[in-house]
């Protein structure tokens, strides 16, 4: 196994074993604080909001990637093994499979024991929609949609960028992702200032989202689900979403599970009608949630396996 392969595998295993320990300082928290400071500074310095937003994007991503590179490089100068360890640790912080499983499991466990109010409360921690009035199937839908969508931007995308460019590129992606979640809104405050961040997030997830859909399709039969259904619904309904990317993994999951996602959600008290994704062949329940979690882990394992095979082939032919 190559050094890069060992670093990637270590990061994945650390995430699968430990998730995001609350005691461990998380780079995304630091990135969020950096964005807040930069936004305040740039709003005072630059009058053109689009220019300010572009500068915010460049500075936040550049500082984040530079800090990651400096940390790995500095550790390597102390000892080569230290650089490997730091790189693996930084890569670990970019992955969210275990935490995504755990957070959605709290919702599922509450529903299984019949505590709908508690399930709604837990769901509110991981979705942007209003959850207070959701029915049980709607809560299950929220849990399934969250796992499916975040399989792309919480697992496959950061892992892909980590494989390509190590910790600096993976953390640069997390910076773009964090920028979008903080300033990528189409409201009066961020319509122009957050434009560059929102578009960059769409661009950064363009390939990973489609790769996630493909990996889910391949993982579906291994998870006891329908690969043919995943492929069919992904092609048919992958664009039934306001995001150019989020609909792809959601459609693949819906097709694999035989459930229907999407539809009307309530945001800040206002119903927002969205297109449906998939066909309601089966109910949204604990079985559907467990199937989505299996798809997430299956897609991640397939990406690691694919990378290992490609690396082996390149090593042999070199």
Curated annotation (Swiss-Prot):
The keyword Transmembrane helix belongs to this UniProt entry's keyword annotation: yes
Subcellular location: Cell membrane
Pathway: Cofactor biosynthesis; adenosylcobalamin biosynthesis
Pfam families linked to this entry: CobD_Cbib
Record bears the keyword Transmembrane helix: yes
GO biological process, one term: cobalamin biosynthetic process
Membrane topology: Multi-pass membrane protein
Keywords: Cell membrane, Cobalamin biosynthesis, Membrane, Transmembrane, Transmembrane helix
Primary localization class, coarse: membrane
Gene Ontology annotations for the cellular component aspect, listed alphabetically: plasma membrane
Any one Gene Ontology molecular-function term assigned to this protein's record: ABC-type vitamin B12 transporter activity
TM region(s), chain numbering: 51-71, 77-97, 153-173, 206-226, 296-316
Job description of the protein: Converts cobyric acid to cobinamide by the addition of aminopropanol on the F carboxylic group.
Family: Belongs to the CobD/CbiB family.
Record-linked HAMAP family: CobD_CbiB
NCBIfam families assigned to the protein according to its UniProt record, in alphabetical order: cobal_cbiB
The name this protein goes by in its record: Cobalamin biosynthesis protein CobD
Classification of source organism: Bacteria, Pseudomonadati, Thermodesulfobacteriota, Desulfuromonadia, Geobacterales
